[in-house]
Amino acid sequence: LLRAAIHTMQEVVEVGHAHGITFAPMSTFEPAAYATLDDIDEKLITVPQLMHGSRDLEASMLQDLQKGQPTEIRFINGIVTMYGNTYDIKTPFNSLIQEIVEEAQAAKTVPDFETSVTRFAALLNA
């Protein structure tokens, strides 16, 4: 899943840069470093360190799904996909996230973790 997270971040940064967005550093996290997949092995080490402080938090989108409420997926990953299409940048990871969440939202359920992992593994191995 870490590889999928890094690919997702790379898509966000690449699309953002194409749209003229400059990402500000956050603490020790430098979003611009994720504009490419270079040094992915190093990123596989640093991403868990960056996420360590928030490991016990539950995402608001997950909370929405648990309550059967609409999520903000179209305004987060959906925007990345939309602008990716505008700039002819492929965004398969953000698209898959949006697809998984929208399927769960329509079914008023929470995505099955193992099924989602399998879908990301298929994308990584494509």
Model-derived features with residue positions:
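NAD(P)-dependent Rossmann-like dehydrogenase/reductase catalytic/cofactor-binding core
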Residues: 2-126
